[in-house]
Design a protein with these regions (language model features):
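Active-site catalytic microenvironments in core metabolic enzymes, especially phosphate/sugar-handling
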Residues: 1-327
């Protein structure tokens, strides 16, 4: 707990978010801390000054490459946060406009990675090795398929205009950060624990559990409820795996490995057509909880965790599709 202050500054908020995410990392804190120790060892072994200067030192304490402070215009106490799923240049201009109307926004947060965090967000995919191993996939298979996916995503994001929105934040003199996996960890672990405790028998039971949560209720009002992408409501769920964190969707070939490990149902935010076709091939049921609603649940749980851990308060102004629920 940070004492003697009513509010957090940006760095304190950032580090609290990371610590809260490690608390609920599906791999477990021990594996994450070992990863950080290995990164520190690699950093200490670098003798080339140029390479050392290029090293992102946030990696020494932050295992989530898709979560970063993108711009600090003014290091101030964070009382009011303007947060959304995709807070890009348009939303940054909106933030500036709202401040002209005395909104007093101290920090803009985008959930999906942006800036230099987006340029290397594929590094987060590495956590899928341990995640899928814990779900019963042989470690050598999980590692090989995860490395294949990392390589593919790295190539796909390489040509993007990564710093477009970060530069806009700088020009508008706005504090700006992205929080991706730190939020996604929360929704995956929360739903995993919910399903473990309730032990749903059929797919209809899983849908009922999701539809009882406020974020999914609100999404349903906007015609985007949890849905079945494979299987019927009467299907028995079998072994259920919630897959909602790890940067991006796993490699399509991982579906065969999950089927071989006995997985009967996947609960996901979203899946590509190729993933869905592969699930059909191996008779894996798919419960699609919803992308933006699941992202929103993760953010809501994260903000709750930060407040509980730090004993500090902050106000949220939701935008860009973010379904804010004060949990």
């Amino acid at each position: 707990m940070i004492k003697n202050k009513k509010f957090l500054n940006i760095d304190e908020f950032y580090k609290a978010a990371i610590d809260c995410a490690i608390d609920v990392d599906p791999r477990g804190r021990k594996i994450v801390e070992k990863e950080l120790k290995d990164i520190k060892k690699d950093y200490d072994s670098i003798t080339d000054k140029k390479k050392k200067n290029m090293f992102d030192t946030d990696n020494l304490f932050n295992p989530y490459a898709d979560t970063r402070i993108l711009n600090i215009a003014e290091d101030k106490e964070i009382k009011k946060i303007f947060c959304g799923i995709d807070m890009q240049t348009a939303e940054l201009i909106l933030s500036d406009r709202l401040n002209e109307k005395n909104a007093n926004i101290d920090l803009v947060i985008t959930h999906h990675p942006n800036g230099y965090a987006y340029a290397k967000f594929y590094e987060v995919i590495g956590m899928q090795t341990d995640k899928n191993a814990l779900n019963g996939v042989a470690i050598n298979v999980a590692e090989a398929l995860t490395n294949k996916r990392i390589s593919a995503v790295e190539k796909s994001v390489s040509p993007s205009n990564h710093n477009r929105d970060s530069m806009a934040a700088k020009l508008l003199n706005l504090n700006y950060m992205c929080m991706h996996t730190v939020a996604d960890n929360h929704v995956e672990t929360f739903l995993t624990n919910l399903i473990k405790n309730k032990n749903p028998y059929k797919l209809s039971d899983i849908l009922d559990l999701l539809n009882d949560l406020e974020e999914y209720k609100i999404a349903a009002k906007y015609n985007n409820p949890p849905k079945l992408f494979n299987g019927s409501e009467k299907n028995r769920a079998g072994k259920i795996v919630v897959d909602m964190t790890g940067g991006a969707a796993f490699d399509v070939a991982m579906i065969e490995a999950l089927a071989n490990s006995g997985v009967g149902t996947l609960v996901v935010m979203h899946l590509s057509d190729k993933h869905i076709d592969e699930c059909k091939k191996y008779h894996i049921n798919i419960v699609c909880a919803g992308h933006i609603s699941s992202d929103s649940l993760g953010l809501n749980l994260l903000f709750k965790a930060i407040k509980e851990k730090t004993k500090k308060e902050f106000e949220i102004i939701p935008a860009s599709g973010y379904i804010f629920v004060n949990r």
